[in-house]
Every structure is written in C-alpha cells, then in structure tokens.
Amino acid sequence: MAIHLYKTSTPSTRNGAVDSQVKSNPRNNLIYGQHHCGKGRNARGIITVRHRGGGHKRLYRKIDFRRNAKDIYGRIVTIEYDPNRNAYICLIHYGDGEKRYILHPRGAIIGDTIVSGTEVPIKMGNALPLTDMPLGTAIHNIEITLGKGGQLARAAGAVAKLIAKEGKSATLKLPSGEVRLISKNCSATVGQVGNVGVNQKSLGRAGSKCWLGKRPVVRGVVMNPVDHPHGGGEGRAPIGRKKPVTPWGYPALGRRTRKRKKYSETMILRRRSK
C-alpha cells in the first residue's frame, strides 16, 4: 500500500495521510445491505457501546472465510476496497464458473492463481490444513473450529506462525503474541494479509472519523462528578484516585477481562503480550 500525501492547502490535507485509492465495484450477487445494529444502542434505544453512531451507508461483501472450493483453481481478477474491514479483498474466478471474495494476501497481484485443498503447493494465497504445512510457515485466516471458517489473523497486515505440531494439535504464535493450540485438521491460508501500511494512515480531521461511524471520545477528567468518577475539581485537577476507573467505577487500563473458566483456557500456552 502506498501512502499518499496532499498539498498542504488546508489543515485536513496538511495532517492527513491516506492510502492509494483502490476502487470498489462489487458484484451484485456478492453484496447485501447491512443493518448497523442500532449504532451502539440496544432494543430500548439506550447506549450500550459508547462512541458509535452515524457513518456512511455500507454494503456488506460476502467473504469466503471457509475456502471450501477444494482442488479448483481460481484466478485473481480484481483487488478491491472493502468498507467493512481495513484489509483489501480479491475477487476470484474459479474454474467451475463460481465467483467469490477472499482476503487479499500480501504480494498477490491480478492474474495470480490460488487453490484450496489437501497437499496443495505451499504458495501465497493457497489454503490447506495445518497438518500439511511445514514448521515456520506464515499463515492467516486460521480456523478455530473445523469447517467453521477462518477466525484468527484476518486484519490488515496480520500474520501468524506455525511453530510446532504434536499429536492432534498444532502450536501457533498469533499476531498478539499469544501461543495457543489448534487442531491440526483446521485449515489456514498461506501468507500475510495485505495492506500492511494501514497503521501509517492519518485521517487528518474529525469529519473523516465520523464517516467511519465513530463518535468523539471525551476524557473523564474534563467531565463533571455526576458524569464520571474522574470529573470535578478546580481547574485542571488530577483524577483523585490511585488507579483510573471506567465511568461506572470499575478498574480500567490493565485489569484482565478474560473469564478464568473459559472452555479454551487449556488451549492457551502463553497469554498475549501487552
């Protein structure tokens, strides 16, 4: 991804840094309208998730996370922008006439061929079970449950690494630094997700943030005591506590939120690094 800088004629162009324009011309049979789930509200209209609302209308692209078109070669026809994720997507034309979207692997270009199945070549964009991959392979779009489709390492620039295979399980190092076990029969896609420079983007102005459906974030220390535990005081005052808390008084910034008795606790060998 190439970062594009504008001529500094306004504050928004001076501070903004956007990626090169990748056009989107989705196929009608691979898109459908998506309800935005109340923009952070529940069925009664009460805010349950803050800082959400507004945003441009979107059409959801059906992404093939399962990669279950076995032993059928496909060709990359287009590389498109997807408003629902920070990674690009590819339109694949398969040999049997079917067309699907997949996540764009880093380095893939229009005209490349991909295939899914067992014992397929270890090539960027190919999908196969972990048991058929050599150790050290860089992978993304990893299944947790067999046949459910990829659920791990799907964001732009994400990549995991196969570090061991023993018995019925494979050991993976995830992008977060977590090391966990997954069934060797689960499939994954070879390579890294594209658009690796997405973290270099700068929106440059508040309006661009609103287009993404993200509302402004206000610090608790500038609120009144009735609105936040950090609020109040004369002038610029500290929070008045040993540790920061949420608007509802629960510990924030560092407290672990994962359930201790979750079913997958035994599959995690090393928790993610901070």
UniProtKB/Swiss-Prot annotation:
It holds the Pfam family Ribosomal_L2. GO terms for biological process: mitochondrial translation. It is found in: Plastid, Chloroplast. The keyword Plastid applies. It comes from the Eukaryota. NCBIfam families: rplB_bact. HAMAP family: Ribosomal_uL2_B (MF_01320_B). PANTHER family: LARGE RIBOSOMAL SUBUNIT PROTEIN UL2M (PTHR13691:SF5), RIBOSOMAL PROTEIN L2 (PTHR13691). This is Large ribosomal subunit protein uL2cz/uL2cy. The lineage of its organism: Eukaryota, Viridiplantae, Streptophyta, Embryophyta, Tracheophyta.
